[in-house]
Amino acid sequence: MSKPSLDLQILTLPDNPGVYQYYDKDGKILYVGKAKNLKKRVSSYFNKIHDTAKTNVLVKKIVTIKHIVVPTETDALLLENNLIKTLQPRYNVLLRDDKSYPWICIKKEPFSRIFLTRRMVKDGSEYFGPYTNFKMVYTILDLIKELYPLRTCNYDLSQSNIDSGKFKVCLEYHIGNCKGPCEGLEPLEEYQRQVNAIREILKGNFKESLKDFKKLMNNYAQNLQFEEAQKIKEKIEVLENYQSRSTIVNPKITNIDVFSIISDESAAYVNFLQISHGSIIRSHTLEMKKKLDESDEELLELAIIELRERFQLMSKEIIVPFEIDLGENIKTTVPQLGDKKQILDLSIRNAKFYRIEQLKQLQIVDPDRHVNRIMAQMQKDLRLPVEPRHIECFDNSNIQGTNPVAACVVFKDGKPSKKDYRHFNVKTVEGPDDFASMTEIVYRRYKRLLDENQPLPQLIIIDGGKGQLSSALKSIDELGLRGKVAIIGIAKRLEELFYPGDSIPLYLDKKSETLKVIQQLRNEAHRFGITFHRDKRSKAALNSSVESIPGIGEKTMLTLIQHFKSVKRLKLATEKEISAVVGVSKAKKIVDFYKTN
């Protein structure tokens, strides 16, 4: 891959947290790193000479950059940890298992112990985490210890050992940190109830535990132990802000493949995440060019078969966004909530980012090709005789007929041409009559273009349904432009497209780039019109207000309108601020007027 191609990969990286992977010309992994902002972090490698020769050698070898987008920087840290262990890149300091992030373990044994560990032992015990913040782990363990007096000893508390009196209570019992299950002083059922409550805390369900904390806090307060009550309050706040699990890693999800798909009119993008032993170890996105009108279901089935064969995937369960048929030997899961749904959402997010990057690269490498493709697609979708290189869209704005205005926005080659935007004060219409207003402004716009011998658009879009379109057509007919300029109306509720003389609207695919361009035009016309209407209302209100002030003439009124823009700003201004605009004498009159009115 050439250097410009590498620059292009960097340029189109997202500004999101994630993990990046560097590969050499032979496709071998060189380095894995995490980033709060992928684009900034990766760019930094190529924008300077590094202090170490090793890093400079690494940069020279990089040919391909891959990345995985994740929700947070913490998730990036965890995923980096997993990928370094799995891929063992040459330029990374390899992370060994005894350097892993810590977990909280609920031991599978009578009177379960709860403790911090770096190793997961497959003995039926439960593990929660991993945690990147050690302070948070110790805070949680301290909370558990304060709220629930559990044992910390390593005794084998089988019923026979307890009955035989093999063990004696220790100091923890005497200072109130343990209820003495080793001597049978605490029933197993009561102990298990506390373990269940702790399990809910670690799962993120704090309701019952928070009730217990608040009860403890209130008891301290009633006993005038305000310092202790404050400590519990602070721990409640920590617990409420705590998120107990990573969306990237969950030990209960193991040996599962996740597939998601997003598509547009011409292509589909299938992302694949491989989960092994509770961790993401691989991510890949496959682009599929559509040849016919294939459904997402058909494309996803084809992609899954291709990816499973390419990467020799043997998992018996896959997570997908909708039901598909892959035969009896593969279980498909369509999660609606929980950890599996979060991982599916992450896969979808990576597919979306991949598509955005591909489109960005196309725009940078060959911007004309990108525009030409959209224009050709619009001509086809809208059944136009020519490509709509010049489009104009109209929108009316008025509130109960007051200050009626209209806006016309212009797009050229699919992009806003703001220097060509125009707004109109409606002159010939009385009251709230949007249809008559549309007739007037369309006539004025194209009468002027014809008089000045200016180029006409290839497409006119009217914001509104059949009624608004019919009103615009009156002017088009009067000017003799019927058949010379294409004109359509768009109804907001269902995004229906109406054509002259056709009672049945056209519905475009919601993913259609054509529809997106039309929606952008409509929204821009609405924004431009509303802004103009708001300014006009403010000036009208200020004009009316200033006219009522004795001793203030038309010239002063105009000066005030130009400076303060609205009545509210004029009323809030100090006498000194007003005098700087119109003089001391007139400023006093204005301030006195607003004090009494």
UniProtKB/Swiss-Prot annotation:
Keywords: Cytoplasm, DNA damage, DNA excision, DNA repair, Excision nuclease, SOS response. Signal peptide: none annotated. GO terms for biological process: nucleotide-excision repair; SOS response. Residues 15-93 form the GIY-YIG domain. Interacts with UvrB in an incision complex. Residues 207-242 form the UVR domain. The UvrABC repair system catalyzes the recognition and processing of DNA lesions. UvrC both incises the 5' and 3' sides of the lesion. The N-terminal half is responsible for the 3' incision and the C-terminal half is responsible for the 5' incision. One of its GO terms (molecular function) is DNA binding. This is UvrABC system protein C. InterPro entries: GIY-YIG_endonuc, GIY-YIG_endonuc_sf, GIY-YIG_UvrC_Cho, RuvA_2-like, UVR_dom, UVR_dom_sf, UvrABC_protein_C, UvrC. The gene is uvrC. GO terms for cellular component: cytoplasm; excinuclease repair complex. Its main location: cytoplasm. Belongs to the UvrC family. It comes from Flavobacterium johnsoniae (strain ATCC 17061 / DSM 2064 / JCM 8514 / BCRC 14874 / CCUG 350202 / NBRC 14942 / NCIMB 11054 / UW101) (Cytophaga johnsonae). It is found in: Cytoplasm. PROSITE patterns: GIY_YIG (PS50164), UVR (PS50151), UVRC (PS50165).
